[in-house]
UniProtKB/Swiss-Prot annotation:
Pfam annotation, one family: EMP24_GP25L
Annotated segments matching region Interaction with ARF1 and IL1B: 207-219
The name this protein goes by in its record: Transmembrane emp24 domain-containing protein 10
Lineage: Eukaryota, Metazoa, Chordata, Craniata, Vertebrata
Quaternary structure and interacting proteins, as annotated: Predominantly dimeric and to a lesser extent monomeric in the ER. Monomer and dimer in ERGIC and cis-Golgi network. Forms homooligomer (via GOLD domain); the assembly is promoted by direct binding with leaderless cargos and may form a protein channel that facilitates cargo entry into the ERGIC. Forms heterooligomeric complexes with other members of the p24 family such as TMED2, TMED7 and TMED9.
Amino acid sequence: MSGSSGPQAQRGPCPFALLLLLLLGPSSVLAISFHLPVNSRKCLREEIHKDLLVTGAYEITDQSGGAGGLRTHLKITDSAGHILYSKEDATKGKFAFTTEDYDMFEVCFESKGTGRIPDQLVILDMKHGVEAKNYEEIAKVEKLKPLEVELRRLEDLSESIVNDFAYMKKREEEMRDTNESTNTRVLYFSIFSMFCLIGLATWQVFYLRRFFKAKKLIE
């Protein structure tokens, strides 16, 4: 028994944890690239949860050689129109902000120039939440070992998933309350409509009865 326990103790980290890191880690980073014609505007929208760090890097390749006074304006806003980041004549840079509420955020690139100018190539890489954290810097500050850094990252990722499930549960409860409220209103409206129809039918019966009596068609 003692001979077999030694190698097992030296196996290292849990294979399941490493598998989660391999599956969830690389797939969480996504760069978007597109072509931006001159005098055009393209926007990207994304819903992001509350109190999350959002970081991004962008690079705009100008293939015109500076002809036509080509300039590109980058602006990031929330659904209320508040400007979170703005850059005139953007070429390459980074940005960061923290969300205050769950909201829809919009990243817009607008190109302005004159003449026939080739399309610009825009590359945008946005990260938020766990993806936006600089774990290399955290490791230096807290003097963490590589395995401890990966475990910290896995812990943050698990917390993020739990928060997502909690938000979805809250949304489900809100939708259920809305459905129940709607069903109650429909029921009350149906009852009101039924009484209106009964009242209208009763009025028509009495009206026709008086009409026929006036015409002496009935006694």
